[in-house]
Amino acid sequence: MNKDMCVACDDGILNIRVGAIIMKDGKILMVGNERANYLYSVGGRIKFGETAEEAIVREVFEETGVKMEIDRLGFVHENYFYGDDPSNLGKLIYEISFFFYMKVPSDFAPINESFTEDNSKEHLKWVSLDASIKMYPEFFRAELKNQTDTVKHFLKDER
């Protein structure tokens, strides 16, 4: 099996991932877990040898139980931050993410729970873009309210 695109670099980590934008009735499908006090997009790391498109289709299926098609690439996000997970606590992480709008089937009924690579339980949650809940990426709130066909690039640097 191919390894995740997560590479140790000097004192930090390079992480290449994909995220899904799954919208229905003005809400976005997000993921939470037992350890985090925030929500994040459906998605995960690209595996070596996989394209970003292949990765998002696989990740959406793993987390929702539904095979979905890609609509279009929406955002590229570069993010420098310090890890908060026990495996990367305090390490500088440079994460490059590709966020894809997905074609949501009319009968879309995702599973409610999945598991992370370390067997932590994850849960799916439909969230209004106006909800005052902490979610990442932070630009989703504003950008998804005013969608365009243009691919946008964002940089967040917490160094």
Region spans (language model):
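Acidic, metal-coordinating catalytic segment for phosphate/diphosphate chemistry
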Residues: 1-19, 25, 89-90
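A generic structural micro-feature
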Residues: 12-14, 88-96, 116-121
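A structural signal for short, well-ordered beta-strand segments
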Residues: 20, 73, 98-102
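Conserved hydrophobic "DFG−1" position in protein kinase catalytic cores
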Residues: 22-23, 30, 102, 126
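Conserved Nudix-box catalytic region and its N-terminal flanking loop in Nudix hydrolases
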Residues: 24-63
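A short coil-to-beta-strand element that immediately follows conserved catalytic motifs
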Residues: 67-76
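Active-site-adjacent beta-strand/loop module that shapes the phosphate/pyrophosphate-binding cleft
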Residues: 81-111
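NUDIX/MutT-family hydrolases
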Residues: 101, 113-146
